Regions:
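Terminal targeting signals and extreme-terminal segments of soluble enzymes
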Residues: 1-250
Length: 250
């Protein structure tokens, strides 16, 4: 997703910024094969500009998206309140939680699945979960996230990074609501679509809160929505995702 956003920005006037992103995951991609990104100029307007981007691998579209860009302008304002959650300094990091789980299960770090090994960013979940013992949980999750400060101030890069981050764990709230996760036997779990809206100019140097909830899981699909807040409570972005949650019989 981040790469398609950057590709679209290469065709956009510098006065415009991405405010709306809608995408579909069409086919599985192969990390060992190259991907070609094609950008279609759908509309160039004074206030709004639209681009369609397609990711093609071995002659087939594996992903496509539509992105709307807007010139910044003043207008009426309102936003929802940030959830009342503990400050990040009072919480354990994902790494600390992982090490506790490893010690409890007497596992080596090398035995941990790739998806739950240490990330390059720091994440401190408000609600803890044991990946190896999934159980039904309330359909929401809150996580404080912080980068190492190395992300450029360039808004294109900051938006692309936040779009990338937004895909981490978004479907997890829907999985939690039915007591499964990516380690569950016979579970087929995959993103089907992803949408994101950028509300403000970004500054991702410090902590920000990713608050996710899942209104419904049904018909082998889970639906989740996320709100991303700066530490001082400003809503900087929103996102939604529907994903496949298909549990095959033995």
């Amino acid at each position: 997703m981040a790469q398609t956003l950057i590709a679209a920005y290469k065709t956009i006037d510098v006065k415009h910024f991405a405010h709306s992103y809608h995408s579909y995951f069409l086919r599985p991609g192969n990390m060992d094969k190259s991907i070609t990104f094609t950008v279609d100029r759908i509309r160039d307007g004074k206030s709004f500009t639209t681009r369609s981007v397609k990711a093609i691998q071995e002659g087939e579209a594996i992903f496509n998206c539509s992105i709307s860009f807007q010139k910044r302008e003043k207008g009426l304002e309102h936003q929802i309140e940030m959830p009342d959650v503990p400050e990040p300094e009072s919480l354990k990091s994902e790494q600390e939680i992982r090490e506790e789980i490893l010690a409890e299960l007497k596992m080596n770090k090398e035995d941990m699945p790739m998806f739950i090994k240490q990330r390059e960013i720091e994440m401190r979940p408000v609600e803890h979960q044991n990946y190896f013992k999934p159980e039904r949980m309330p359909p929401y999750k809150n996580t404080w996230i912080k980068t190492d400060g190395s992300i450029p101030k360039d808004q294109v890069i900051q938006q692309a990074f936040l779009l990338y981050i937004s895909d981490m764990g978004l479907l997890g709230a829907a999985n939690n609501s039915v007591g499964v996760n990516f380690l569950t036997k016979n579970l087929q779990n995959a993103s089907l679509d992803h949408a994101m809206w950028f509300h403000r100019k970004l500054d991702l140097d410090g902590w920000f809160l990713y608050s996710i909830d899942s209104p419904v899981t049904r018909n082998a699909r889970g639906f989740s929505r996320g709100s991303i807040f700066s530490r001082d409570g400003k809503l900087i972005a929103s996102c939604t995702q529907e994903g496949l949650i298909r549990l095959w019989e033995n």
